[in-house]
């Protein structure tokens, strides 16, 4: 599957950063490649269902880290929204040993997404001296987990005290669930504050907006992927927003997957795209608050789709927006935008940004 993850996605200039298929116009080649990638993901899901059983499909997403090992018989699932880590196995022999190994590796994995293939069962997770989950999880004694000895002891405790099993009619599934600390979201956000501040100064984009976008897109999951092949913390698509940013910076081609999986590069690219939306594509909107609402919505659904809410003529659309109050612009975008996802997106990001502004 790995060789298909870099499928070329050719899209219009004004397409969004994280959208699945929305844009100003449809390019036939882009549609074909997007459909091809979607088909491949469907096949991957079908294979997982054949192995694990009906309604047991779990696949990596923007806010879900999912890694399969042991010929797809063991998986680690971190739900960054709920703050839970679930390790499961259907191994018929020594299931506890499979769980123990997966628990230790998950607790001690690093934060280099480019080194891990989430669509294969290759055991490519390396134990890090600075685990990504350090501080986001504590053991049964309330201590954070950095070293293999503590992780091993915690794994033994979990297997003795929290091991569960269930049958789905096809398999017996053994599992252990670990709850992350209550402020796990803030712990992850803190890792990237320096990068956010640097990008904010470089492009003139408010730190609170960058953080709100990151929270909404990925819950600060650097391993974030999507069925539209959006990558990393700010869910940047290589061949749309990534290509636009590279072009604006005088670079040819598109950013690589490894580039976008690097947190600093991802934040820089996502922030550069926000600046392009604000200063170029939606620069005709005078009121900064109205323009911010438009930029947020456009990051998800494309600048063209935002303007078409007001008029099919882009210049006229900006003129109409300039006659409206920011409150009316917000109300219009959250009720009249054709995409329900984009309508919800503006609400989520705006709410998150308010919380970061209060800090």
UniProtKB/Swiss-Prot annotation:
Keyword Transcription regulation set for record: no
Where mainly found? membrane
What kind of membrane protein is this, topologically?
Answer: Lipid-anchor
**Which keywords appear in this protein's UniProt record, sorted alphabetically?**
Cell outer membrane, Cell wall biogenesis/degradation, Lipoprotein, Lyase, Membrane, Palmitate, Signal
InterPro entries reported in the protein's UniProt record: Lysozyme-like_dom_sf, Murein_transglycosylaseC, Murein_transglycosylaseC_N, Transglyc_AS, Transglycosylase_SLT_dom_1
Q: EC number(s) of the enzyme?
A: 4.2.2.n1
Spell out the GO cellular component terms annotated for this protein, sorted alphabetically and separated by semicolons: cell outer membrane; outer membrane-bounded periplasmic space
Q: Where in the cell is it found?
A: Cell outer membrane
Mark the residues modified by lipid (N-palmitoyl cysteine).
17
Q: What induces it?
A: By SoxS.
Signal peptide positions on this chain: 1-16
- Per the record, a Pfam family? Mltc_N
Q: Does the keyword Membrane apply?
A: yes
Q: Name one GO molecular function term.
A: hydrolase activity, acting on glycosyl bonds
Q: Which family does it belong to?
A: Belongs to the transglycosylase Slt family.
Function summary: Murein-degrading enzyme. May play a role in recycling of muropeptides during cell elongation and/or cell division.
List the NCBIfam families hit by this protein, alphabetically.
PRK11671.1 (NF008670)
Which PANTHER family would you find in this protein's record? MEMBRANE-BOUND LYTIC MUREIN TRANSGLYCOSYLASE C, SOLUBLE LYTIC MUREIN TRANSGLYCOSYLASE-RELATED
Q: What is this protein called?
A: Membrane-bound lytic murein transglycosylase C
